[in-house]
């Protein structure tokens, strides 16, 4: 945006013949100029004199640092040195430029569709590389598929939410500094903090950037955080009730996974033996096949010798779980 303020000086009346050319500098950016030329002519002595005024303006692109070049106008108290006291990297307009060039923070200036496409791609890559291996170490995908998928998806969504939160905090910080009339800065370190009051021209420029460039980004990031938060809460609640849901689906679909439990109960009723007693029959199961089958089902498919220290040591402890070994 190029702003030009022209002050028209009062040209005094000339009582004698005027034939002169002069130029006066009104105001300029560092790379622009405005020149006014004036002169008078008279045909005959005693006649009414005429005076003409011509203004020629030349403006080129401002080549100041990061679009924040200083300006100088006659009749105004602000001069280019008003921003010199603040280090270049701590000026809000330069912080905004650095934010736009950042690899991650630049996502904020994308359109909503492209922004959500990138978030979806990030979620998919994180889910494949990190979420699935971690969830598989905690939940068996074949026995607990619902809890496995929920654990992997919820963990990945949480990481993506943290990244969106980091982007939001960066844009919110720069937006506050652009909209504020007084900002803190440090001359050389944390121990010499100062406060800088923005001149009116700088404040108008910064608030224009903050209102039309930063606020829409912050609004979109807020909506994204609210959406991811709602998804996280829903996934967590579903994860808590995942086991009852899995049991419901197994019962509804009539899966055959419940048949071993039925056979265990029938065999237990046949021998009138409890499950705890079936697990402590390392000797009797040698001669009774039905009793051995019931004991194997009660042990969840593991060898019965896992519950006996002597036979476990004799067999080498193969196929035994850790809770069996510590007992």
From Swiss-Prot:
One of its GO terms (biological process) is response to iron ion starvation. Mostly expressed in seeds, leaves and flowers, and, to a lower extent, in roots. Residues 66-88 are annotated as: Disordered. Required for growth in low iron conditions. Induction: Accumulates progressively upon iron deficiency. The chain crosses the membrane at residues 119-139, 148-168, 225-245. It is found in: Membrane; Plastid, Chloroplast. One of its GO terms (cellular component) is chloroplast. Residues 1-59 form a transit peptide. It holds the Pfam family CGLD27-like. This is Protein CONSERVED IN THE GREEN LINEAGE AND DIATOMS 27, chloroplastic. Keywords: Chloroplast, Membrane, Plastid, Transit peptide, Transmembrane, Transmembrane helix. It is a multi-pass membrane protein. Its main location: membrane. Disruption phenotype: Stronger growth defect in iron-deficient conditions. It comes from the Eukaryota.
